[in-house]
Regions:
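N-terminal secretory signal peptides that target proteins for export/translocation
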Residues: 1-32
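Prokaryotic Sec-type signal peptides and long signal-anchor helices
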Residues: 6-9, 28-29, 40-43, 94, ...
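Positively charged, low-complexity intrinsically disordered regions
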Residues: 9-11, 34-35, 52, 199, ...
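Alpha-helical and His/Cys-centered functional microenvironments
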Residues: 12-14, 37, 71
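Bacterial N-terminal signal peptides
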Residues: 37-51
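Predominantly soluble domains enriched in secretory-pathway, periplasmic, or organellar proteins
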Residues: 52-479
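Periplasmic c-type cytochrome electron-transfer domains
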Residues: 222, 263-265, 290-774
Length: 774
């Protein structure tokens, strides 16, 4: 018997034959030529048909990196993670079909996906579930065929070049799970990679051996340089761990140095005690922070990051920067070719500047020394070229208008990018708009061909829609607001000046902390995570703590002043015309800032939406430490005995509360602080070198004490601790006798180091699953 298949038009040419599976033997019949079958023996009649045969691609064309979307090696199938919907969408992208094949429900909050080079199987890292889903790709009947338990908060996935091993970064477990893709089982856990691993990349030497490669792992938050002053522009360094795929063990580490000169000047230097003047004379630096991704090209690995430039005085263009660092893979050292991508935008004409805020990830072409960096807050992708000899990257200009940087506009809050093997298409995952952009890489300049929906947005008018709009505003440097009169152009650009800055630039996209000590007007202040601003056990979210270390704000809407004075934006609180910024915005008085006339987004008040996100959309990180661990149990008992809960008790793990309806009576806020919420526990040291106010025109707050910090998910925010970072560890925090005896009227019950160690272990175990201490 024989089987005949008719020829169809394919990318290889009008007469290129299709390869189809014979259902009886599982073998391929080729094109319009015939295969004769006799007792399972195949005789090829027309050998010329071989020229059209497309064998499965079983190896990736170049190095691989972790992303929230993934392509098969032949570029025909795309997987897109939908973190807010607990699903993965599967698309046919061959020949620009860009059609949804299926949508598969996976574990809670999938953030990373991967797919075997030859297709057939995909994977998703489900952050809250603590699992990796194994997805059988079977057209419209795709499904989860296995669920693998991994570490705490799995975030990123990356496959070896031939797909034999899958590595999973467990962000809160500070570990890497190694998965054998043949058996889909965890074969090893690598535990000493450093806190909060996020970005993964694997080299590719082009052979069949996956055991001769190197895995590169970024540590999300920068590491303090012990020789520097926290709050200085060179206080910290980025860190990348190296892992051998042969041994699955850490083989080294690379530190990414601060950039000495960002190219933007300040009017003074608070750390050096040079008061602010009127001229911009003083050089500023920045260190790599928020290292979410890493990508390999040639002999270098490139790491985009939000650079922290914390020294005062404040100005919109000397706080966060847009860094791209290079690692020399041969020397395993920083190549010292870090650039500030913002600099490329600085010379552009106003008012059309758009800075490259929050460079979140990147991908390279396979056949050219060209890459694409995703600016999550500015909703753009920018192009870079790299010198393959030195590692120096250059931001490319628009060939149509060389006075401008090439900006490829995407959907809202892009967070991932992949390039196909033929370098013809790039695909960008847009987190907030829940879609992906298809970029034509063959055109000059590159352009978006299509935007394809991956998941549904919340129903308009619902609480989820309000939270989602708040998340959108929290994560944007621009903002797109309803016009005051229907039919008029949208109002844009109110969140920052020229797209420089966003809430997420300091609080991360998850509403947490960048762990930076900033030199602010109140003094040195380590960024406070917002996951404990509201009592998450209260369904009404009416219970709120006071805000900032010095309790000098009572409403989330007071941070309108940060939009204006830190990010340089015009803000969201407006006059009756619905457009003009209202200049009467202050902390405390004379007006409450909540429920004032605001810009609106799709009919929702902007600040109401941001507040809804901060109250209900920010999740407390999960702890990797079990509450049943004996040392944790002992530590909790000691915590109670020392009456630590007198300051750090309750559902928010802080006694700080907003106990009045704003605006407060003047008697409640002498010196601009809510004094009733402050505690003096020996943590203010006016002689500390970084205990300065940003403009040096007054003393820093602190003599009256600070509001008690929340202990909820404390493990997620590594040292240094306290408002100005003087304690490298929690043990150092507890070495302060005044602090540890504050709940026992000065009687020190924690003189034993082992007791303090037990309390530290308990503190590191606290998360939203821990029963609060009343």
């Amino acid at each position: 018997m024989f089987s005949t298949f008719s020829s169809q038009s394919q990318p290889g040419g009008p007469s290129a034959p299709i390869v189809k599976m014979n259902p009886l033997f599982g073998l391929s019949a080729i094109g319009s030529h015939r295969l004769f079958w006799s007792f399972g023996i195949v005789v090829l009649v027309a050998i010329t048909a071989i020229r059209g045969y497309a064998a499965p691609v079983l190896r990736f064309p170049g190095p691989t990196s972790s992303q929230p979307l993934a392509l098969t090696a032949d570029g025909t199938t795309l997987l897109v993670a939908n973190p807010d919907n607990n699903s993965v969408s599967i698309f046919d992208v061959k020949d620009d079909h860009n059609v949804l094949i299926d949508k598969v429900n996976v574990g809670k909050e999938p953030n990373g996906v991967a797919v075997l080079p030859g297709g057939g199987t995909g994977y998703s890292a489900n952050t809250v579930a603590g699992t990796v889903s194994v997805i059988k790709l079977n057209g419209s009947a795709s499904s989860v065929k296995k669920t693998i338990a991994v570490g705490v908060e799995p975030y990123a996935l990356v496959l070896t070049p031939n797909g034999k091993k899958l590595y999973c970064a467990n962000a809160r477990g500070s570990s890497i799970s190694v998965i054998d893709t043949t058996t889909n089982t965890v074969v090893k856990t690598i535990n000493n990679v450093g806190p909060e691993p996020r970005g993964l990349a694997i080299s590719n030497d082009g052979d069949d051996d996956d055991l001769d490669e190197t895995l590169y792992v970024t540590q999300f938050l920068a590491v303090l340089d012990a020789s520097k002053i926290d709050g200085a522009d060179n206080a910290k360094r980025g860190r990348v761990a190296l892992i051998s795929t042969a041994t699955d063990a850490v083989s080294g580490e690379v530190f990414l140095n601060p950039l000495a000169d960002t190219g933007f000047k300040a009017s003074g230097d608070a750390i050096a005690r040079i008061p602010a003047g009127t001229a911009l004379l003083y050089k500023t630096g920045a260190y790599p922070n928020q290292l979410n991704a890493i990508a390999i090209k040639g002999k270098f690995a490139f790491v985009p990051s939000t650079g922290a430039s914390p020294n005062g005085p404040l100005r919109f263009d000397v706080n966060t920067q847009s860094l791209l660092s290079a690692i020399n893979l041969a020397t395993k050292l920083d190549a010292n070719k870090t650039i500030n991508m913002h600099k490329a935008v600085a010379s552009q004409p106003n008012p059309t500047k758009l800075f490259i805020t929050q460079p979140w990830t990147m991908a390279f072409r396979n056949k050219k020394a060209e890459g694409y960096v995703v600016s999550a807050a500015s909703n753009i992708v920018v192009k870079v070229t790299v010198n393959l000899t030195t590692g120096l990257a250059t931001v490319k200009r628009d060939p149509v208008d060389p006075s401008r940087v090439l900006e490829i506009r995407t959907g809202k809050n892009p967070r991932g990018i992949v390039v196909n093997a033929s370098d013809t298409r790039a695909y960008v995952m847009n987190y907030i708009s829940r879609d992906f952009s298809v970029i034509d890489l063959t055109s000059s300049p590159e352009r978006v061909l299509e935007t394809v929906k991956s998941e549904n947005l919340p129903a308009p008018g619902s609480q989820l829609a309000q939270i989602h709009i708040g998340k959108e505003l929290y994560n944007t440097s621009i903002g797109e607001f309803d016009p005051p009169v229907a039919g008029q152009p949208a109002i844009v650009g109110r969140m920052s000046r020229d797209g420089w800055g966003s809430c997420a630039a300091c609080h991360t996209p998850w509403g947490l902390s960048d762990n930076v000590v900033w030199i602010f007007g109140a003094g040195p202040r380590r960024t406070i995570s917002q996951h404990a601003d509201f009592d998450q056990t209260d369904p009404t979210r009416k219970i709120q703590r006071v805000l900032n270390y010095s309790a000098n704000r009572d409403e989330e809407e007071d941070f309108e002043l940060n939009i204006r004075n830190v990010s340089g934006g015009k803000g969201l609180i407006v006059l009756a015309d619905g457009v003009t910024p209202d200049t009467d915005v202050n902390n405390f008085r004379p007006k409450a800032n909540a429920k004032r006339k605001q810009l609106r987004v799709r009919g929702v008040n902007a600040w109401d939406a941001i507040r809804a996100f901060e109250a209900s959309g920010i999740r407390a990180p999960l702890s990797p430490i079990s509450s049943s661990e004996p040392q944790v149990v002992a530590g909790q008992a000691l915590f109670r005995a020392a009456n630590c809960q007198s300051c750090h008790g309750g559902p928010q793990w802080t006694r700080s509360r907003l106990r009045f309806m704003p605006p407060p009576d003047v008697s409640l806020t002498p010196n601009g602080e809510i004094l009733s919420e402050l505690r003096t526990v020996g943590t203010f040291d006016p002689s500390a070198f970084n205990e300065v106010q940003d403009r040096l025109d007054g003393p820093p707050f602190g003599a009256d004490g600070y509001q008690p910090a929340s202990l909820l998910s404390l493990h997620a925010f590594p040292g240094p601790y306290l408002h100005n970072g003087p304690a490298d560890s929690l043990d150092m925090v507890l070495n302060n006798v005044a602090h540890r005896s504050a709940g026992t009227s000065g009687v020190d019950t924690l003189t034993n180091p082992s007791d303090r160690a037990a309390i530290v272990r308990f503190l590191q175990s606290i998360d939203a699953r821990t029963a609060p201490i009343p």
